Regions:
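Sec-dependent N-terminal signal peptides
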Residues: 3-12
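Short loop/turn motifs at secondary-structure junctions
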Residues: 2-3, 44
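Glycine/tyrosine- and acidic-biased, solvent-exposed loop/turn segments at the edges of beta-strands
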Residues: 14-124
């Protein structure tokens, strides 16, 4: 049976922020961290972050208070950004950008209210 260590950090300097890390790699790097904010009547998930075993961030989601507007970012294990996308009212809205492993911009897709309007490729 595997036992997972929970790391809980309260920071009163940041208006009642709670960070939970339910699982760790063998090298004590957290596999993920969930950041919550306590308001007067509820606890809201503000950010979820996943990590590679080397400690490099692999995925991050930033949420607003209702959870329908968010920004998602992915990274390669070398630290270069892989993808970035934003959501508004639960639908893709804005620019969905992808990069190659070497950091070169690969593609941009332009969305409004969940519908793709156009696409721009940067590959040669």
């Amino acid at each position: 049976m595997r036992i997972f260590i929970a790391l809980i950090t309260m920071s009163f300097l940041q208006a009642n922020i709670l960070r939970l890390s339910p699982e760790f790699y063998d090298n004590r790097i957290p596999k993920s961290i969930y950041t919550y904010k306590e308001t007067s009547n509820k606890i809201i998930l503000k950010e979820s972050t996943s990590y590679y075993k080397n400690g490099q961030m692999s995925y991050k989601v930033e949420y607003d208070s209702n959870g329908l507007n968010m920004r998602k970012t992915w990274w390669y294990n070398n630290g270069n950004k892989s993808k970035l996308v934003t959501f508004k009212d639960g639908k893709i809205d804005g620019i969905w950008t992808t990069w190659k492993y070497d950091g070169e911009k690969e593609l941009e897709r332009f969305y409004k209210n969940g519908l793709m309007l156009k696409e721009r490729s940067y590959t040669k």
